[in-house]
């Protein structure tokens, strides 16, 4: 009797747990008796993955927090490597968390265990030398975006574009009224969303600029109301204090979380760069991307970052389809000037481009990822 297929997985944070859940579901179609084990969160565990360590043991944010748990994290990494070397899985899949997973993948591959890295690190943007470690550590990289695969192809590193899970989740036709109803917003309200980031340092720098920009827009377009999702109570308190100082009369409604619904409710959005820009594109919301960091971070980033654009919509399109205002260009005057053409217009050209890009990256990523695992197991890439 054949032994069931054994698949090792490591997710390092909540987003990886969601990806792992979808991947396990899709793999069960191919291998209904497969055994899954590794580092998992509640969603992966619910799909039958045995957690040798809980995801929470790795899920830390910030330099100081990582330092505080570094000893524990390194011990976990050593134990998981030793476990998989002693009990080799048929394949190992590291989900995101490259600082942790690439070392695991490298050690396992040295012991002839097949390895896949799911979610490309941003090597195309900065620290491009990491591509050589990735090449040694993995049999295949699974990339969400087409320009990522193009980068790997330049270095002859096996990579497969599988589409983006977020593009699978969001409908091609936006559901604005449904989103507004879920938030208790008026169906016919004119709404500008503001997303100044989720980290304290981001909100500290961008909050005042975004609020002053909104205040100026409010004077020019008095029909508009402003909606903001804040990731937690601390960021909400931070923004409210900034509002009292910079825009006390602004008609502002703050939501606890619910960033997706806020984005989908908006007629336009002002946001910091990051995944939010991709989500706004998929929600078909015209946007301005504005970003500013402290001077030292900017100087270091300018030396390291090797891309023309900072926002994912522009990177996917390989041209500027949304306005980007970074660092010295991130001013109230520039933001207002960039937002004005988006307000009260149908923006059909931008929205049609968003639809085209949505279709490009809407590929049923869970199914594609599972098929990639099957192909590597069968020595096809």
From Swiss-Prot:
Its EC number is 2.4.1.182. GO terms for cellular component: membrane. Pathway: Bacterial outer membrane biogenesis; LPS lipid A biosynthesis. The keyword Heme does not apply. It catalyses: a lipid X + a UDP-2-N,3-O-bis[(3R)-3-hydroxyacyl]-alpha-D-glucosamine = a lipid A disaccharide + UDP + H(+). Pfam families: LpxB. GO terms for biological process: lipid A biosynthetic process. One of its GO terms (molecular function) is phospholipid binding. InterPro entries: Glyco_trans_19. Keywords: Glycosyltransferase, Lipid A biosynthesis, Lipid biosynthesis, Lipid metabolism, Transferase. The keyword Calcium does not apply. Disulfide bonds: none annotated. Condensation of UDP-2,3-diacylglucosamine and 2,3-diacylglucosamine-1-phosphate to form lipid A disaccharide, a precursor of lipid A, a phosphorylated glycolipid that anchors the lipopolysaccharide to the outer membrane of the cell. Belongs to the LpxB family. This is Lipid-A-disaccharide synthase. It comes from Psychromonas ingrahamii (strain DSM 17664 / CCUG 51855 / 37).
């Amino acid at each position: 009797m054949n032994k069931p297929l054994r698949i090792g997985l490591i997710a390092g944070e909540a987003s990886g747990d969601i990806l792992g859940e979808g991947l396990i579901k899709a793999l069960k179609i191919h291998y209904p008796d497969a055994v899954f084990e590794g580092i998992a969160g509640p969603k992966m565990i619910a799909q039958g993955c045995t957690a040798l360590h809980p995801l929470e043991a790795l899920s830390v944010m910030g330099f100081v927090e990582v330092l505080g748990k570094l000893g524990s994290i390194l011990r976990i990494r050593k134990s998981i490597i030793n476990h998989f070397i002693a009990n080799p899985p048929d394949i190992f899949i590291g989900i995101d968390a490259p600082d942790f997973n690439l070392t695991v993948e490298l050690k396992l591959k040295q012991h002839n265990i097949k390895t896949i890295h799911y979610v490309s690190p941003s090597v195309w943007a900065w620290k491009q030398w990491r591509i050589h470690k990735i090449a040694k550590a993995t049999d295949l990289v699974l990339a969400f975006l087409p320009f990522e695969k193009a980068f790997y192809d330049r270095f002859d590193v096996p990579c497969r574009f599988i589409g983006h899970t977020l593009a699978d989740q969001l409908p091609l036709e936006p559901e604005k009224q449904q989103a507004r109803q879920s938030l208790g917003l008026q169906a016919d309200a004119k709404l500008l969303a503001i997303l100044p980031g989720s980290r304290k340092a981001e909100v500290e720098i961008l909050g005042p600029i975004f609020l002053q920009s909104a205040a100026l827009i409010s004077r020019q377009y008095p029909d508009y109301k402003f909606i903001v999702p804040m990731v937690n109570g601390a960021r909400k308190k931070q923004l409210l204090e900034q509002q009292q100082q910079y825009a006390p009369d602004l008609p502002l409604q703050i939501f606890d979380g619910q960033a997706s619904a806020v984005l989908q409710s908006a007629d336009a959005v002002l946001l910091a760069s990051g995944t939010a820009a991709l989500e706004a594109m998929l929600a078909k919301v015209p946007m301005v991307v504005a970003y500013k960091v402290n001077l030292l971070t900017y100087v270091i980033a300018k030396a390291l970052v090797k891309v023309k654009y900072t926002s994912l919509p522009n990177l996917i399109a390989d041209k500027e389809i949304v306005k980007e205002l970074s660092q010295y260009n991130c001013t109230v005057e520039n933001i207002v000037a960039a937002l004005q053409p988006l307000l009260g217009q149908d923006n059909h050209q931008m929205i049609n481009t968003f639809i085209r890009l949505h279709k490009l990256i809407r590929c049923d990523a869970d199914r594609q990822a599972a098929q990639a695992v099957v192909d590597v197991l069968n020595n096809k890439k």
